[in-house]
Amino acid sequence: MNVKNSLSMNKALKTIVAAALLFWSAGLFAQTFDIVERRDFWNAGRNVNGLRTDSLTVSYAELGVDYTSGGFRDVNDPKTAWSAGAEAGTITHLKKFSMIGAFSFRNAESQKACGSMSARPGYYPVDIYEFTPGRKTRQTYSFLGGIAVDLNDSWRLGGKLDFAAENYTKRKDLRHTNFLLDMTFAPSIMWHRGDLALGTSYVFSKTSETITAEELGITSGVYYAFIDKGLMYGVQDIWDNSGLHIKEAGVIGFPSRELTNGGAAQIQWRNFYTEIEALASHGSTGEKQKIWYNFDGWSMGVKMDYRIPGNGHSHYLRGRYSIRTQDNDENVLEDVTENGVTTTRKYGTNNIFTRQSINAGAEWELLLDSGEYFNAGLGWTQDREVSTMTYPFINTCRADVFNVFASILVKFGRFDLKVNANVSKGKDDEYHWKSQGIEASAEPFRLSEYEAAMTAYETCAKVNGCLSVRYNFRKGVYLEASYEGISRLKKKFDIVEGFSAGRIRNREALTIGYNF
């Protein structure tokens, strides 16, 4: 073979390789990160070894800003807010192992915000509320990492770590600062042969949150706070009084923490997949000898999925059910001083709050190989809460919310058009009892208007819609603009004094990203 023919063949080979890479890249960008992650059932569960059941490598990075306004809002929502952030994610497959990773950072600024001091209102059974609207800043950091390794032809071993941290501050008296940490670690193992795959995972989770408050400068005002012990029953007082526990000797702020342990089991037979999970948790509020509240709980969940493959498309059927219960006990404590040494004694506990939450849903999705999709489904959420803060009064509340949703993504050349819609309607029932023959001086204090506003917001008929348009440049770069609006469907709406009675909440967002 002469040199001229050799050079010609090398040139042809390079042309073929370049064309193959271009074709592969076009297919890759058609399958965005969220679609690649969603099409594999294992990715929605605890077992990271499910990464090895797929082979498509995909990554993305994006920057985004958004602005939120409008009067239809919960009592914990600000009047207006904007945020900016960056995030990235990757799923990578190599010969013997696969990896998933993601990180994000977001800074949010809220105007005329008050209500719960917690970064996650309602997560813990005890919460602190303040009533002076001001500016709040929230910085959120998150990290996800997971790896799955083939030990041999049948066994796989892996683990996944999910970590998040938040700094949440208010810059107007009554000022407060909130530090939140959340970590979940799930080591897993999988056995597979042919069309059958079996997996199991251990789940460990730790959450913690500390709220500190302060008053700066000289002011003639008196700032009040409220401790919610369930169903908005609790104590309202000057913020630094001991009954609220925000500023108490020997304790830094208002610290809460929760540890969760449990496990999950997975099975896949051909195109059918299911996962069952059971978790137990123990939490407390306070520190050292001064543990004011202890809360224990458990949860169970089931996921069932089925895939129907077709020519250039696949149908997905998904079902979900979960239940979570939690009891909160208030400890009876007293500071005792002996020989100049002060210790805290515990005399007993009172069960003051119990809650149970059930979530169920079903979904059908049509996913095309081009990346277009259509899905629709329905969901049901039930919250049952019982407050026994003051004997002999018993107060219960039950709220059921039903929703139907649909979303579609279609492509027009370089444009992606996505539309989401969700309609929900709920109902609630409250009951109040008092044990007969037991005298009581007064009923427990309640922020009734706040409870009414939050319940009305949760259960009222409303529609949530989102429209987004993405333009895909060459080599995976894209620019996306979106609008999301939520509107109540009824005219009458119970609100807290000072909150707008608007019917719509708007969110506009702009994102630039890169798929690679």
What label would you give each PLM region?
Residues S25-Q111, Y124:
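N-terminal, post-signal peptide beta-strand-biased segments of exported outer-membrane/organellar beta-barrel
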Residues A61-Y67, G101-N107, G159-A165, T200-K206, ...:
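Transmembrane beta-barrel strands of outer-membrane/channel proteins
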Residues G71-D77, K112-S118, Y168-H176, I211-G217, ...:
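Outer-membrane beta-barrel translocator domains and adjoining extracellular loop/strand segments
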Residues T80-A86, T137-F143, T177-F185, P255-N261, ...:
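Residues that define the transmembrane beta-barrel architecture of outer-membrane proteins
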Residues L94-F97, D150-S154, H192-G194, R270-F272, ...:
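Outer-membrane beta-barrel channels and translocator barrels
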Residues K96, S314-Y316, F353-R446:
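Detector for outer-membrane/organellar transmembrane beta-barrel domains
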Residues W191-R193, R503-F516:
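Outer-membrane beta-barrel "beta-signal"
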Residues D237-A376:
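Long, internal scaffold/assembly segments composed of regular secondary structure
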